[in-house]
Amino acid sequence: MRRLFPALVLLLAALAYFELAWAPFYAFPPPEPFRGEHWYNPYAGYRGGGLLANFHAHSEAWGGLTFGNTPRHELHAMYEKRGYDVIGISDYMSLSPSEGSDGEIYVSSYEHGFTPGRHHHTVIGADHVTWFDYPLGGSTRQKQDVIDELRASAPFLVVNHPTKAQSFSISDLEQLTGYDAVEVATKYGVWDDFWDAALSAGRPVWGMAADDGHAQTETDPGSHLGIGAVVIHTQERTRDGVLRALREGRFHSLYTRQNEGPIALELCEIEGGQLHVRVGEDASVIRFYGPHGDLRHQVTGRPEASYALGADDPYVRVEVIAHGAVLYLNPVLRWDGVALPKPTARVLLGTTWAVRIAGALAVAALTWLAARALRPGSQGTALAAPSGVRNST
């Protein structure tokens, strides 16, 4: 026990160093509303149709530890039977191989993260798994460091289920940069308030619905198969075409919590300063939201609605509810007509390395003390086990 105690202290010190001292310190861009004389409309020219896709679902993997209970090929076949064009089986830290026919549009996806705090992301389009993570940490700077690591290999990166285990806060999404989308609706709930927080802070991120199912079946009424999906607005049936449309926000999300039928989007256009939306049926309500989720306008019982875009609208997004289902449109944003803003958290190199060096010196000192305590013939040091845990003779 006398030799084990110093080694345990050293191990805990090394873990504390990685969790507390290694993550960079950042200067996060302050909140800044979207600005510009032009409106970026990801739906300009859209007249219906698209590729039906899901990127977040779990099969039987890792010996059942992740609670998926359906073999991957069977789950893939279920989505294929429902007419999905793009099927992403996002098992934890495991790329989903192609399971479909030769005509399948294969876009890889996996869920990154193995932390108790569930700070997870769906990584779409990567060619390998990134294993870097902070197993215990949940600070904003640790989350930003993980995003930066994932960004190097992730063509499209989604922040998952923000309130599951309190994995992300409103403040996190207002500060973090480098992610492309936030899950707005899955079996775990709805997070349009987190989405609005990010948009209100000037983060040009899109909203994505998904199943996130772990127990998927065709017959079980409790299955989450098909409750969340995206319709991608592209005629390119290729990986690159899908990823390009995702990055540009050219998709809309469908959330059918009780497996209601989908809502068909027909158009979303800006003409004469009016944002005009039309769907294929009379909607229960069509709502137009501005910053911080402020309800700007709504129309009930009609298949279409318009809203006059104001000078004080940095962005406007639309939700359509019909027969219990919800259609989420990505926002129209003010921009300069050239490129959407790309806020980027800046690493504070001086602070980062000062803390890393100080932490390394502290671990080195503990290593020296532990080595003394473990040296044969040592009479004990500050790191020796307390007398209460030594064996009596």
Indicate residue ranges for each PLM-predicted region.
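Glycine-rich loops and low-complexity Gly/Arg-rich segments
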Residues: 77-81, 113-115, 130-134, 148-149, ...
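C-terminal functional module detector
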Residues: 1-46, 62, 216-393
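A metal-dependent hydrolase metal-coordination microenvironment
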Residues: 15-177, 183-201, 208-220, 329
